[in-house]
Amino acid sequence: MDSRATQVNESIEQEFLSVIREYERVIYKVCYLYTTPTAILNDLYQDVVLNLWKAFPKFRRECKISKWIYRIALNTCISFIRKEKNVPEFVTLNREGDWMTEENDPLQEMLRQLYRMINQLGQLDKSIILLYLEDKSYDEISEITGLTVTNVATKLSRIKDKLKKMKKEE
């Protein structure tokens, strides 16, 4: 391989690594909602990164990179769950990620409680509410999930109602 091709490959690799560093927490959050054991969480994270790497040369920047990352991460996680027959339909989020660190912080406890409730939702509902909590617009959620904007709005309303009902039942 000539030096120009090597430079191009190194440039692509550096760009990819920069993207992964920027979106690492987002990828972990998506993976976190779909698995419990830390070893599996790390394996799933690696699968997502591998799928992102495989798809990176084909990324044409026709959409925001965050949408592209969410789409691949969600699809990888859902595929993983389908393959793993021994993984339960929902997982418990009682261990702490690096994004939930303060044990005595009331806000952190509320977040833990919210994520435990979210974990009881179906796969699509989990994906939708996760994107909503990441401040994605209905249009962005629609593009990532493949649902219509109207369907996203309806589903979000129902998801919020389910979460409110779960909260009251606790």
Label for each model-derived stretch:
Residues 1-26, 33:
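N-terminal module of bacterial RNA polymerase sigma factors
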Residues 15, 26, 113-116, 126-127:
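Pre-recognition alpha-helix immediately N-terminal to the DNA-recognition helix
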Residues 21, 108, 118-126:
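Short helix-coil-helix linker/hinge
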Residues 29, 43-50, 54, 63-75:
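Structural recognition of an alpha-helix C-terminal capping motif at a helix-to-coil junction
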Residues 48, 72, 128-129, 141-142, ...:
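Hydrophobic positions on the alpha-helical face of helix-turn-helix-like DNA-binding modules
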Residues 79, 86-114, 137-138:
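Internal acidic/polar
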Residues 120-140, 144:
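Short amphipathic alpha helix immediately N-terminal
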Residues 145-169:
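DNA-recognition helix of helix-turn-helix
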